[in-house]
C-alpha cells in the first residue's frame, strides 16, 4: 500500500513543472498553555494576503472550546463603589473607559491646540479628518514585501481595478481597500479576522418590499379582479432553487472546519493553478533566487507603496509573456519571477444584519475629537509634538466621543425661555442710554401733573430690567434680607406711622399723607388723638391714625376685639376685608372717597400711596385691597416667582442657577447658542454630559454668587460664569496635554487672547465681569478635579488622585467663603461697578433703574 502511494506521489512530482515550487508550513502541535485555534496567530504572514492591508487578526474561540468559568467571590459594595469612583474620575489602573478617555483627549488636543509632536503623530497614527478622496476609488498601489519575510513577494492582481466601488460597503467608513482574489472551496484565518476580506461576499437576501409598493400592488390586483395571494404564490413557484441567503448559517465559522484539500496534493494543486493566467502568479528561476540570497540586506520597506517609475520599469501591472498587451521593445528586463505564497479566501457571504448595520454606521459616522485639538485648536492651528510615548498613544486610540445631550437640551431651554420672555413681557427700548417718557397723569391730589418715567435701554433686544427680575434674574435684594433695602423700608414705615388721612374740604376725596403734604387751607388732616373722632384703646385714645377707609370700630373681618385688638401702631394693622357700617359712619376719614392706594414702584421696595393711573404709568404694582404701604410687601411683588416663606425676609436663593437659563435679549441668546454649539458641544463630546453639566452649573452658580456680593443692586442674567468656566476647561486641557504639543506656548497665548477679549467685552452694560472672573476660577478648580486626562506614568497617576482631592477642597472652600460673605458679612464696594461697566457717557451705566446708592 505504501509502495503504491509512493509511486503515485513520484508520478505527480514528475508531472510538476520545474517553475512551480510550494512551501507549505508544517503544522505546529498545540502547547498546553494555549488552545490549538490560536497557534496560527504566531505567524502573521499566513494570516493575510500581501495585497490586503495589514490588520490585526482576531479569531473568536469556537463554542465547543468554551469552558465554564471558575466560580469567584462576588465583589463587595465597597469595592464596587471604589472602582466606579476611580473610573469616573479617570484614575483607575485597569479601566477601559480611562484608556478611551485618554485617547479621545489626544484627538481633541490635536484639533483644538495645534499640531502634535511628530513622534506623537507617528506612534498615534491618527486617522485623517479629511473626507475620502477620489484616489481611494482607484486601484490601490501594490505593496512591497521584503524577500526575507517567509518568501512573500509582490502580488499584483490586474483585475483589481474598480474594487473600491464594489466593496465600499464592507466598512463603516466606506473606505476602499484591496481584496484578495477569491478561491472557491477554501477558507483562511484572515477571512474570519478581517472585516474587509471576502468572507462577507455571498449573495444577499432580497430586500423587503416597502409598504407603499405592497399597497400599490394590492390596489392593482384589486382593479384587475385578482387576489394578492395568487400573485404572490405564482411568483414563489417560479423559484426552483434555494436562496443563497438561507445557507449563511452553514458556512465555515471556525478554523477547525477549514477545507484543507487545497493543500493536499501537488498534482491537484497544479491543475487548479494552471487555470489562472501566468500574468498574475509568477515564480522566479533558481538562478534569480540564488542572486537574491547573495544580495545585501535591503531596507525594511514592507507595506510601502511602489513608485510609479518602478511599476513602469518592471511592468508589474502588464502581462510579461502573453495577454492583451505586449512588452515594448527596448524596455528594461522584467524582474525575475518569485515563488508565490498567497492566502486563499472563502466565498462565504455577509453575516446576518450587515445589510442594515453598515449603512446605519455610515449615517452616524462622526469625526472623532482628538484630545487637545478640538474646534479652537483647528482655529489656532495646534499640532502634536513629534515624539510621544506608546502608552499615551494607546490612551488616545481608546477614546470615543460622547453625544452632546446636555448642549442640545441647554440650547433648547435657552431658546424657549427667551422666546416666551419676549412674547410675554415685550421688548424694552433698544440702545445704550436711558429712555424717558413724559405724560400728564392724574395724581392722588385730584389734579393732572406732568410726570416722567425713566427706563434703561436694552441693546440686546429684550425685556426691561424689572421684567428680568420678575423672571428670575440675579438680584441680591430678592435672595437675602439686604441691609440697605431693609433700612429703606423701615424708614418709609416710620414715616407712615405718623401719617393720617387728608380729607379735602370740597368732599372730592381723601388720601393718606403726612402733615406736610396735606394743605391746611383746602383739606383737613384727621390726626389722632387731636381730632375728636379718635377711638379708645385700653381706656385712652389712640395716638396714631387715622387711616383712610379703615377703622377698628367698624371692621368686622378681622374684628378688633379683646384679646385680639388692633395694636397702637397703624403700620401693624391688618387689611380690613369687611366693614359693619355703610357709607355713613359719621367719621370723616371713613365717609370720604379714597383717591390713593399703595403702589409698589421700581425695584428697591419703594411704595407710594397714589392713583391707579400714575401707578400704571410708572409700571408699578397697584394694591386695590390695601390702604397702607405697610400692609403690602413690595419686594415680594418685585421679585415674583415663589412667595417668601417670611414676607419680611427674601429667600430666593435659587436665582443663583435660575438666572443661568435667562438672557437679556435675543442677541444675547444667539451669542450663547453660538458658544454652546461650538465650544461647549466640542468639550461635551470629549468629556460626556455629566462632567460638563457639573462644571457648567457649578461655575455659573459660583460666578453669580460673586456677582451678587460685589454688585448687589444690578439685575444680571445669562450664563456668563458658566461660559467662562467652560473656557477654563480649555486651559486645563491645554495644561494636561502640554507634553505632547509641538508649540504649547503659542496655543496658550492664543487662548489667553480670546479670554481677554471676552473680558473686555464684559465692560459693556448688562454683562457681568465678576461672574466671568469667578466662573473662570471655579471652572479651573472643577476641571482639574473632574476632567480625566492623559497620564504619563504611575507617578502622574498618583499625582492625579492628589489633584482631585486638593482642587475639590479648594473649590468647596471658595464656595463656602462666598456664601459667608453673601449672607453674613455683606461687602460694600464703591469702585466695583467700574470693573463691569465703564461709563463712557453720563448715562451709559446709569444703574439700570437699580441704584447702588439707595435714596
Curated annotation (Swiss-Prot):
Side Cytoplasmic, residues: 1-411, 677-691, 736-746, 794-803
Transmembrane segments: 412-432, 656-676, 692-712, 715-735, 747-767, 773-793, 804-824
Compartments in which it is found: Endoplasmic reticulum membrane; Golgi apparatus membrane
Glycosylation sites noted in the Swiss-Prot or TrEMBL record: 583
Modified-residue entries (Phosphoserine), positions: 76, 176, 390
Disulfide bonds: none
Record-given protein name: Inactive rhomboid protein 1
Source species of the chain: Papio anubis (Olive baboon)
Taxonomic lineage: Eukaryota, Metazoa, Chordata, Craniata, Vertebrata
Amino acid at each position: 500500500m505504501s509502495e503504491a502511494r509512493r509511486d503515485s506521489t513520484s508520478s505527480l512530482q514528475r508531472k510538476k513543472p520545474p517553475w512551480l515550487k510550494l512551501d507549505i508550513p508544517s503544522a505546529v502541535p498545540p502547547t498546553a498553555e494555549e488552545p490549538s485555534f490560536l497557534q496560527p496567530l504566531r505567524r502573521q504572514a499566513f494570516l493575510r494576503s500581501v495585497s490586503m492591508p495589514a490588520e490585526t487578526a482576531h479569531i473568536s474561540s469556537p463554542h465547543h472550546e468554551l469552558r465554564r468559568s471558575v466560580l469567584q467571590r462576588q465583589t463587595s459594595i465597597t469595592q464596587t463603589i471604589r472602582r466606579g469612583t476611580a473610573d469616573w474620575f479617570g484614575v483607575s489602573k485597569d479601566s477601559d473607559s480611562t484608556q478611551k478617555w485618554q485617547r479621545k483627549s489626544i484627538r481633541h488636543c490635536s484639533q483644538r491646540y495645534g499640531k502634535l509632536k511628530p513622534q506623537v503623530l507617528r506612534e498615534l497614527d491618527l486617522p485623517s479628518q479629511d473626507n475620502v478622496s477620489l484616489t481611494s476609488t482607484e486601484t490601490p498601489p501594490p505593496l512591497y514585501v521584503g524577500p526575507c519575510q517567509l518568501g512573500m513577494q509582490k502580488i499584483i492582481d490586474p483585475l483589481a481595478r474598480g474594487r473600491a466601488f464594489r466593496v465600499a460597503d464592507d466598512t463603516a467608513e466606506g473606505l476602499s481597500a484591496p481584496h484578495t482574489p477569491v478561491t472557491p472551496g477554501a477558507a483562511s484565518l484572515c477571512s474570519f479576522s478581517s472585516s474587509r476580506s471576502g468572507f462577507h461576499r455571498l449573495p444577499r437576501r432580497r430586500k423587503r418590499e416597502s409598504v407603499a409598493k405592497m399597497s400599490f400592488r394590492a390596489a392593482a390586483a384589486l382593479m384587475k379582479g385578482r387576489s394578492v395571494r395568487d400573485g404572490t404564490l405564482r411568483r414563489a413557484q417560479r423559484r426552483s432553487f434555494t436562496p443563497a441567503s438561507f445557507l449563511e448559517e452553514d458556512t465555515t465559522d471556525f478554523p477547525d472546519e477549514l477545507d484543507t484539500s487545497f493543500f493536499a496534493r501537488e498534482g491537484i494543486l497544479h491543475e487548479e493553478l494552471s487555470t489562472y493566467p501566468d500574468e498574475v502568479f509568477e515564480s522566479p528561476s533558481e538562478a534569480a533566487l540564488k542572486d537574491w540570497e547573495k544580495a545585501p540586506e535591503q531596507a525594511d520597506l514592507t507595506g510601502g507603496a511602489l513608485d510609479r517609475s518602478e511599476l513602469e520599469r518592471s511592468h508589474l501591472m502588464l502581462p510579461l509573456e502573453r495577454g492583451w498587451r505586449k512588452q515594448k521593445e527596448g524596455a528594461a528586463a522584467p524582474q525575475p519571477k518569485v515563488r508565490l505564497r498567497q492566502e486563499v479566501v472563502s466565498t462565504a457571504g455577509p453575516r446576518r444584519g450587515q445589510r442594515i448595520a453598515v449603512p446605519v454606521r455610515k449615517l452616524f459616522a462622526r469625526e472623532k475629537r482628538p484630545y487637545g485639538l478640538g474646534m479652537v485648536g483647528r482655529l489656532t492651528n495646534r499640532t502634536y509634538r513629534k515624539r510621544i510615548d506608546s502608552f499615551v498613544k494607546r490612551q488616545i486610540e481608546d477614546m470615543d466621543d460622547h453625544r452632546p445631550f446636555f448642549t442640545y437640551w441647554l440650547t433648547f431651554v435657552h431658546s424657549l425661555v427667551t422666546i416666551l420672555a419676549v412674547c410675554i413681557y415685550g421688548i424694552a427700548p433698544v440702545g445704550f442710554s436711558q429712555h424717558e417718557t413724559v405724560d400728564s397723569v392724574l395724581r392722588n391730589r385730584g389734579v393732572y401733573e406732568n410726570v416722567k418715567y425713566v427706563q434703561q435701554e436694552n441693546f440686546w433686544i429684550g425685556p426691561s430690567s424689572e421684567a428680568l427680575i420678575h423672571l428670575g434674574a440675579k438680584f441680591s435684594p430678592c435672595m437675602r434680607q439686604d441691609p440697605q433695602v431693609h433700612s429703606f423700608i423701615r424708614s418709609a414705615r416710620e414715616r407712615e406711622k405718623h401719617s393720617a388721612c387728608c380729607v379735602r374740604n370740597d368732599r372730592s376725596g381723601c388720601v393718606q399723607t403726612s402733615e406736610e403734604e396735606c394743605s391746611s387751607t383746602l383739606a383737613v388732616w384727621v390726626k389722632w388723638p387731636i381730632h375728636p373722632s379718635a377711638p379708645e384703646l385700653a381706656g385712652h385714645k389712640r395716638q396714631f391714625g387715622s387711616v383712610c377707609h379703615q377703622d377698628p370700630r367698624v371692621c368686622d373681618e378681622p374684628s378688633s376685639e379683646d384679646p385680639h385688638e388692633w395694636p397702637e401702631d397703624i403700620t401693624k394693622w391688618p387689611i380690613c376685608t369687611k366693614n359693619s357700617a355703610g357709607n355713613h359712619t359719621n367719621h370723616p376719614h371713613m365717609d370720604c372717597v379714597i383717591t390713593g392706594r399703595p403702589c409698589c414702584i421700581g425695584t428697591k421696595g419703594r411704595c407710594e400711596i397714589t392713583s391707579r393711573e400714575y401707578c400704571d404709568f410708572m409700571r408699578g404694582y397697584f394694591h386695590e385691597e390695601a390702604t397702607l404701604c405697610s400692609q403690602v410687601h413690595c419686594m415680594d411683588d418685585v421679585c415674583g416667582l415663589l412667595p417668601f416663606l417670611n414676607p419680611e425676609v427674601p429667600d430666593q436663593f435659587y436665582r443663583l442657577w435660575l438666572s443661568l437659563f435667562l438672557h437679556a435679549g435675543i442677541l444675547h441668546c444667539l451669542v450663547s447658542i453660538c458658544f454652546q454649539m461650538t465650544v461647549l458641544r466640542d468639550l461635551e463630546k470629549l468629556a460626556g454630559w455629566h462632567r460638563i453639566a457639573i462644571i457648567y452649573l457649578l461655575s455659573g452658580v459660583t460666578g453669580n454668587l460673586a456677582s451678587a456680593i460685589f454688585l448687589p443692586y444690578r439685575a444680571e442674567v445669562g450664563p456668563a460664569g458658566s461660559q467662562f468656566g467652560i473656557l477654563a476647561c480649555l486651559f486645563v486641557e491645554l495644561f494636561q496635554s502640554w507634553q505632547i504639543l509641538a508649540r504649547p506656548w503659542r496655543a496658550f497665548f492664543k487662548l489667553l487672547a480670546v479670554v481677554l477679549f471676552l473680558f473686555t467685552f464684559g465692560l459693556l452694560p448688562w454683562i457681568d465681569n465678576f461672574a466671568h472672573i469667578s466662573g473662570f476660577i471655579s471652572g479651573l478648580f472643577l476641571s482639574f478635579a473632574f476632567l480625566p486626562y492623559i497620564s504619563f506614568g504611575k507617578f502622574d497617576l498618583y499625582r492625579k488622585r492628589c489633584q482631585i482631592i486638593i482642587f475639590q477642597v479648594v473649590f468647596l472652600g471658595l464656595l463656602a467663603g462666598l456664601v459667608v460673605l453673601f449672607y453674613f458679612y455683606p461687602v460694600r464696594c464703591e469702585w466695583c461697578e467700574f470693573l463691569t461697566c465703564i461709563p463712557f457717557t453720563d448715562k451709559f451705566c446709569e444703574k439700570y433703574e437699580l441704584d447702588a446708592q439707595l435714596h
